[in-house]
Amino acid sequence: MPKKFQGENSKSAAARARRAEAKAAADAKKQKELEDAYWKDEDKHVMRKEQRKEEKEKRRLEQLERKKETQRLLEEEDSRLKGGKAPRVAPAKVTRAQIEDSLRREQRAEPVEKAKSHLELPLEENLNRRLQEEGSVEARTVEDAIAVLSVAEEADRHPERRMRAAFTAFEEVQLPRLKQENPNMRLSQLKQLLKKEWLRSPDNPMNQRALPFNAPK
């Protein structure tokens, strides 16, 4: 007679069940790790994408701001140029007091030089020398000669100092005016313009040398 089937061993079944459960747990853990890694990579990709988008927008806004600033500066410059030159200001007269004040400053800054007066030289020598220098003055009498010498002595005792002092006073008054009238000129151009005006100015001692000794002051 064949043996009767007695069924599966309970211990073997329990062991198989435990192995199956452990394998299922390991598989579930591995699957979870794979899913976590996937979503982690996806999050990084999304973050990088968002970061690049933000940086691109930031650069666009910066470029737009620079364009606006450049346009504003161009409009200001165009408006200033279209406005034309500043209103012309009437030339200010250099006064005798200003010239004398500049002369005094020059004299204080330089050593005092002793010069012979007309009293230390013969009248004829003074007269001839002054007539040669001035050319346009004629003295027919002793009184005229004294007048010529007095005027010449006052005007030309220190001609180089007087010229520098007069030009300094002229520049102090006229250069600010030229800057206001010609805001687009460089300083070198303004000084060239100032020299041209100085050559024609009645404040230039060289323009006063040819005046007759008895001309009204």
From Swiss-Prot:
Residues 18-74, 98-120 have a biased composition (Basic and acidic residues). It comes from the Eukaryota. Residues 1-120 are annotated as: Disordered. One of its GO terms (biological process) is cell division. The modification Phosphoserine is found at S136, S188. Ribosome-binding protein involved in ribosome hibernation: associates with translationally inactive ribosomes and stabilizes the nonrotated conformation of the 80S ribosome, thereby promoting ribosome preservation and storage. Also required for proper progression of late cytokinetic stages. Belongs to the CCDC124 family. This is Coiled-coil domain-containing protein 124. It comes from Mus musculus (Mouse).
